[in-house]
C-alpha cells in the first residue's frame, strides 16, 4: 500500500527519518525555489530519481492542498494500535500523552500533531471512528511531526482511558465550564491531556473517565478557541511546569 505526501517539510521529515519508504518523487516543472533545491539535492543523494510534472498534475494529487512544488508517493508508515500502548508507557519515565476526542478536521489534527511534537508528547491517541484521518493534508499541516509522534487509533476511547489510569496516568480533560484552570492544575506527573471537539467538547463517557477537568481562562469577548490553538496553550503549560529543555 502507498500514500501521497506533499510539501517541503513533510517530505524532508520523512527523508530524514525513513528514506526507504519513498517510491516516487515529483517536482513542479520550471520551479526554481531556494528552499526546494537543497531538498532535491538530498533526495538525489539518497538515490531517488526526481520526476518533473505539471502544476495541473501536482494539483490533482493533493486535493486542493498547497504542495509547494513537491509531491511524493511513499509506502504507508507504521499503523499504531491500542495494544502498542503498554509498551510505550513502560518505555518512558513520565508519560505525556495527548488525547483528541472528536477532532474531525485534518487541518486541526495536523496542527495538534505539530504542537504535540514541539511539546515532547510521547503519543497522540484518537478514536478510530470519530477522528480525522492522518491523510496528506494532516501530514502537510503537521510539517514533519506526523513522522515523529505516534498516532494511536483506538476502538473504545473510554476503555483506553481506563488502561491509562491502570498505568498510573492522570487523565486531565478540558471543559469550558470547569472552575479549575490549567494554571491551577499540577501537571508534572504521568498524564494524558484530553481535548474535545470544537464546540461540542468531550463526549459524556470521555468526560466521566477524566480524573480532573480544567479550563483555559478567557479575558476577551470570545467564548472558545480553535481546538488546535487550545491544545497548544495547554501543552505548553505542561512544558512550563515540567521545565522541559530542548
From Swiss-Prot:
CDD domains: SpoU-like_RlmB. Keywords: Cytoplasm, Methyltransferase, rRNA processing, S-adenosyl-L-methionine, Transferase. The keyword Cytoplasm applies. Pfam families: SpoU_methylase, SpoU_sub_bind. It catalyses: guanosine(2251) in 23S rRNA + S-adenosyl-L-methionine = 2'-O-methylguanosine(2251) in 23S rRNA + S-adenosyl-L-homocysteine + H(+). One of its GO terms (molecular function) is rRNA (guanosine-2'-O-)-methyltransferase activity. Its EC number is 2.1.1.185. The keyword rRNA processing applies. GO terms for cellular component: cytosol. It is found in: Cytoplasm. Its main location: cytoplasm. Homodimer. Belongs to the class IV-like SAM-binding methyltransferase superfamily. RNA methyltransferase TrmH family. RlmB subfamily. NCBIfam families: PRK11181.1, rRNA_methyl_3. This is 23S rRNA (guanosine-2'-O-)-methyltransferase RlmB. The lineage of its organism: Bacteria, Pseudomonadati, Pseudomonadota, Gammaproteobacteria, Enterobacterales. The gene is rlmB.
Amino acid at each position: 500500500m502507498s500514500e501521497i505526501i506533499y510539501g517541503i517539510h513533510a517530505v524532508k521529515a520523512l527523508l530524514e527519518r525513513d528514506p526507504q519508504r519513498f517510491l516516487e518523487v515529483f517536482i513542479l516543472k520550471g520551479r526554481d525555489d531556494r528552499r526546494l533545491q537543497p531538498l532535491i539535492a538530498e533526495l538525489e543523494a539518497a538515490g531517488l530519481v526526481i520526476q518533473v510534472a505539471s502544476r495541473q498534475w501536482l494539483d490533482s494529487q493533493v486535493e486542493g492542498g498547497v504542495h509547494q512544488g513537491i509531491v511524493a508517493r511513499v509506502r504507508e508508515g507504521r499503523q499504531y494500535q491500542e495494544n502498542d500502548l503498554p509498551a510505550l508507557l513502560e518505555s518512558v519515565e513520565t508519560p505525556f500523552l495527548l488525547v483528541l476526542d472528536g477532532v474531525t478536521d485534518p487541518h486541526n489534527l495536523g496542527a495538534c500533531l505539530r504542537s504535540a511534537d514541539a511539546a515532547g508528547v510521547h503519543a497522540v491517541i484518537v478514536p478510530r471512528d470519530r477522528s480525522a484521518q492522518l491523510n496528506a493534508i494532516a501530514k502537510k499541516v503537521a510539517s514533519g511531526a506526523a513522522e515523529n509522534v505516534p498516532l494511536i487509533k483506538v476502538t473504545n476511547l473510554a476503555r483506553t482511558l481506563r488502561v491509562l489510569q491502570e498505568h498510573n496516568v492522570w487523565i486531565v480533560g478540558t471543559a469550558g465550564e470547569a472552575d479549575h484552570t490549567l494554571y491551577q492544575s499540577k501537571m508534572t506527573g504521568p498524564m494524558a491531556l484530553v481535548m474535545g471537539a470544537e464546540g461540542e467538547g468531550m463526549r459524556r463517557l470521555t468526560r466521566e473517565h477524566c480524573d480532573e477537568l480544567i479550563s483555559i481562562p478567557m479575558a476577551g469577548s470570545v467564548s472558545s478557541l480553535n481546538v488546535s490553538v487550545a491544545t497548544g496553550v495547554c501543552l505548553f503549560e505542561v512544558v512550563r511546569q515540567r521545565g522541559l529543555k530542548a
